[in-house]
């Protein structure tokens, strides 16, 4: 299993959730990046408010750390309603979901993180709730059991997932607003870093923010985590202000290189280059070669490397691109 404390992992770790909450934008106008998604949401939210209706059910998907939870909270704030949050693995029984649904008020947002991990029993309860705002529940056991229908107030279900393909077709079809979040560009990430530094009361110049953004793998959660570590370095080794040079020294010390790669990324790329002559190599062989699970490679390591053009995924397996060779000062064989 991949190290739980990997500095550039996009999943939550340690105090991330508490600190991220303090830095989260509250409204769409404060939200940086994801321009297409933001523009769509503004229209959908305004239309729902004009009609005095609950917003349509929404599925937010994409790699971890890009702001799915933040967007769900922004939706609730923009609509002026309450939000109740839970996650797929927590909803073990139909009664768990029923308890949440029956406590919703008209227009409220129910946010389910990791919605692809809902159990089939819970998912069945969700279908009529999403479509007809009705809750079908069984009362009693055995021959005396009977089904009753409860009316629910109109509500908005916001589901978040890193694996949209793992959702069942019936569940996916019930979301009227699908939103895909993409990795952030350096410009948007540097804006996020500067905003977070301001919230933290940290002096940072534009070049320092850009340097952190470059090494943040297109992910705001990683950018904020690196910013906190660079702040530590700046306070101990310098005067507390973050410049480009301070950021470079701090991140080099943390073994996060100019592309945002750490030991695990370099290990994966070098395995393809050295052990499998650049590929193609199958996922199972690659997982065995670096001592990781295939899910870790698919869900954590690969997405950014593919998006940045360092790995190519083909029907025959993974291939290291010319860019991967150049990263290590090598020339790809013809």
Swiss-Prot record:
Enzyme Commission number, as recorded: 3.6.4.-
Pfam families recorded: AAA_lid_4, RuvB_C, RuvB_N
Keyword presence, DNA repair: yes
Chief location bin: cytoplasm
Positions that bind Mg(2+): 69
Superkingdom of the organism of origin: Bacteria
Keyword set, alphabetical order: ATP-binding, Cytoplasm, DNA damage, DNA recombination, DNA repair, DNA-binding, Hydrolase, Nucleotide-binding
Chain positions recorded as DNA binding sites: 294, 313, 318
A molecular function (GO) term: ATP hydrolysis activity
Segments of this protein annotated with the region Head domain (RuvB-H): 258-334
Keyword Protein biosynthesis recorded: no
Region feature (Large ATPase domain (RuvB-L)): 4-184
Reaction equation(s) it catalyzes: ATP + H2O = ADP + phosphate + H(+)
Subcellular location per the Swiss-Prot or TrEMBL entry: Cytoplasm
Gene Ontology CC, one term: cytoplasm
Chain segments annotated as transmembrane: none
Residues where ATP binds: 24, 65, 68-70, 131-133, 174, 184, 221
Signal peptide positions (record): none
A biological-process GO annotation: DNA recombination
Region of interest called Small ATPAse domain (RuvB-S), as start-end residue ranges on this chain: 185-255
Subunit structure of this chain's protein: Homohexamer. Forms an RuvA(8)-RuvB(12)-Holliday junction (HJ) complex. HJ DNA is sandwiched between 2 RuvA tetramers; dsDNA enters through RuvA and exits via RuvB. An RuvB hexamer assembles on each DNA strand where it exits the tetramer. Each RuvB hexamer is contacted by two RuvA subunits (via domain III) on 2 adjacent RuvB subunits; this complex drives branch migration. In the full resolvosome a probable DNA-RuvA(4)-RuvB(12)-RuvC(2) complex forms which resolves the HJ.
Domain remarks: Has 3 domains, the large (RuvB-L) and small ATPase (RuvB-S) domains and the C-terminal head (RuvB-H) domain. The head domain binds DNA, while the ATPase domains jointly bind ATP, ADP or are empty depending on the state of the subunit in the translocation cycle. During a single DNA translocation step the structure of each domain remains the same, but their relative positions change.
Recorded family membership: Belongs to the RuvB family.
Record's function text: The RuvA-RuvB-RuvC complex processes Holliday junction (HJ) DNA during genetic recombination and DNA repair, while the RuvA-RuvB complex plays an important role in the rescue of blocked DNA replication forks via replication fork reversal (RFR). RuvA specifically binds to HJ cruciform DNA, conferring on it an open structure. The RuvB hexamer acts as an ATP-dependent pump, pulling dsDNA into and through the RuvAB complex. RuvB forms 2 homohexamers on either side of HJ DNA bound by 1 or 2 RuvA tetramers; 4 subunits per hexamer contact DNA at a time.
Identification of the protein by name: Holliday junction branch migration complex subunit RuvB
Species name: Shewanella sp. (strain MR-7)
Species classification: Bacteria, Pseudomonadati, Pseudomonadota, Gammaproteobacteria, Alteromonadales
């Amino acid at each position: 299993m991949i190290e739980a404390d990997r500095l550039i992992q996009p999943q939550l770790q340690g105090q991330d959730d508490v600190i991220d909450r303090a830095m989260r934008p509250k409204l769409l106008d404060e939200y940086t990046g994801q321009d297409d998604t933001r523009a769509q949401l503004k229209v959908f939210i305004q239309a729902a408010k004009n009609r005095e209706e609950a917003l349509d059910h929404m599925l937010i998907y994409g790699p971890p750390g890009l702001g799915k939870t933040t967007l769900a909270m922004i939706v609730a704030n923009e609509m002026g309603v309450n939000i109740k949050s839970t996650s797929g693995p927590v909803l073990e029984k139909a009664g768990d979901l029923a308890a949440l649904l029956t406590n919703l008020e008209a227009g409220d947002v129910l946010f389910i993180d990791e919605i692809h991990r809902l159990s089939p029993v819970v998912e069945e309860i969700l279908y009529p709730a999403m479509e007809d705002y009705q809750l079908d529940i069984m009362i009693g056991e055995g021959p005396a059991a009977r089904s009753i229908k409860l009316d629910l107030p109109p509500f908005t279900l916001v589901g978040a997932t890193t694996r949209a393909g793992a959702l069942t077709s019936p569940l996916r079809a019930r979301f009227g607003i699908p939103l895909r979040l993409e990795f952030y560009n350096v410009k948007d990430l540097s804006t996020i870093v500067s905003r977070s530094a301001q919230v933290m009361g940290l002096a940072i110049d534009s070049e320092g923010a850009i340097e952190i953004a470059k090494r943040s793998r297109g992910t705001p959660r990683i950018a904020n985590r690196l910013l906190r570590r660079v702040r530590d370095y700046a306070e101990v080794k310098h005067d507390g202000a973050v410049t480009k040079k301070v950021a470079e020294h701090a991140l080099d010390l943390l073994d996060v290189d100019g592309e945002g790669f750490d030991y695990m990324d370099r290990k994966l790329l070098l395995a393809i280059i050295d052990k499998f002559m650049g590929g193609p190599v199958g996922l199972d062989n690659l997982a065995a070669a670096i001592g990781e699970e295939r899910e870790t490679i698919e869900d954590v390591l690969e997405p950014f490397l593919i998006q940045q053009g360092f790995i190519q995924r083909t029907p025959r397996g993974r291939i290291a691109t010319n860019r991967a060779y150049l990263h290590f000062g090598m020339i790809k064989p013809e």
